[in-house]
Amino acid sequence: ADPDDAYENRIHIPNADRHLAAWPKDAATFRKSFAGADLNLAYGSSKRTYYDLFTPQGGIEAACGLAAFVHGGYWLALSKDDFSHMAAGLLARGWAVAILSYTLAPQARITQITREISTAVEHLGKTGTGPLRLIGHSAGGHLVSRMMCDDINFGPVTTQRLDRVLSVSGLHDLRPLQRLAKNELWQLDENESQAESPLLRTPRPGIDLVCLAGADERPEFIRQNAILPLVWQGLGANCHSQLLAGHNHFTIIETMTRADSRLCELVDCPLS
């Protein structure tokens, strides 16, 4: 089998380019029309270590919690500015939502990107009140899963608040990615691909994990979605995987815009 094709989404998704073209436009429209937007807040000192904060009526203190979204794009593409509208569903449920950017490869190795996201999460732990929950899509699913691993340390406030992670179409074992043409840009070697794979790490207690993927995704993404909970359950973590019928790699994350979506429920509601 062709390893590049196994991890290729665009050519296998109907109207894929239409989705990708719509996201920045819909995001810009949302930013202009939404009153409770605080844009381009710094969490680090690099050019892309910024986030946008969207708060429901009553402001951050009235929110029932803070959800942070980490975008995908294979650690190579996209930014927070493509995903602002994804805050809509959780805002309607009373959550504040932070949408993050981070330094992309090849300017940063994946190890550095992980460090940036941990800095962002620690910063957000001091923002608002109530639970802190992380949502990541694709490469972002990898990054939020890494925040559960026991080599990532947060201060007491963030540790107390961070209670759930949702990895949507996430990549949890990076070793196969060494075989991809894109690895010219990532520069993953055996050491880094092992160290950066949540699958090969130990989960910290006290954080629930849901891995969610579309039933119409590429088989390799469905496999990556299933493997992390299978391994981490054996290490005592409260985690499970789900497939969402009728959804592919792009449509699944678009359900974040709808308050009644399964994705928003999994962020907001008690897990059975």
Go through each PLM region and give its residues.
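N-terminal cap/lid segment of alpha/beta-hydrolase-fold proteins
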Residues: D2, A6-G59
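C-terminal catalytic histidine-bearing segment of alpha/beta-hydrolase fold enzymes
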Residues: I222, A226-P229, Q233-S272
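Catalytic nucleophile-loop/oxyanion-hole region of alpha/beta-hydrolase
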Residues: L78-A87, A98-R133, R258
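Alpha/beta-hydrolase
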Residues: V70, V168, L244-H247
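Short, surface-exposed "cap/lid" segments of acyl-processing enzymes
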Residues: Q57-L90
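Structural cue for short, hydrophobic secondary-structure segments
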Residues: F69-G72, I99, I135, C211
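Primarily recognizes the serine-hydrolase "nucleophile elbow" in alpha/beta-hydrolase
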Residues: T119-K182, S193
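The feature captures the conserved acid-bearing segment of alpha/beta-hydrolase catalytic domains
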Residues: T158-T159, R164-Q178, E190-I227
